[in-house]
Amino acid sequence: MSLMIEGGRRLSGDLTVQGAKNSVLPILAACILSGDVCVLQRCPHLEDVDTSIDILRHLGCAVRWNGPDLEVDSSTLTRWDIPDRLMRRMRSSVVFLGAILARCGQAELSYPGGCAIGARPIDLHLSALRTLGACIREEGGRLDCTASGLAGAEIVLSIPSVGATENAMLAAIGAKGVTTVSCLLYTSPSPRDRTRSR
């Protein structure tokens, strides 16, 4: 594929940019933490957003569209579990784990699904949450998570993971103390530096 761009003409006009799916999904999970009304302007109306809305409603949140904007009221949150049928509809459903754990001190859910890329384990997510003090029991395809008190910690991911970082950040909001998230890949000294230190 190639593009040919002919310039020399002044550009003018207005363009309304819709929100991005990869940004809005963790923001929807973060709405849980506010305990109040959040408004997402120009929220994209996509299947994964609809699944997130279904999860929020299952948890007890009031969610409604107001034109292109989405309003989420999490003051009415009453549950901390996500059923398998909702978890399996999209890969990023696991990002709700950190937010629910921070808000409720417990969470019950199954492994996520919905990813056409193939199996991608969530061990980095679970490791990050355990580092913050969460107790996580994995049994029969379900995750039973409790946190009597999350504490700030230094989380070092073995490989880069946007989702695990998002989950750690959401859970860290409910933790006491400072949390830092880094990646071993970027924090390890280079081979040259290791040679110098010998």
Task: Please name every model-derived segment.
Residues 1-16, 53, 60-85, 134-158, ...:
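Self-splicing inteins and homing endonuclease
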Residues 30-34, 58, 99-103, 172-175:
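Alpha-helix C-terminal capping segments
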Residues 165-166, 170-180:
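Internal alpha/beta core interface subdomains
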Residues 80-156:
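Hydrophobic alpha-helical hairpins/lids featuring a short glycine-rich hinge
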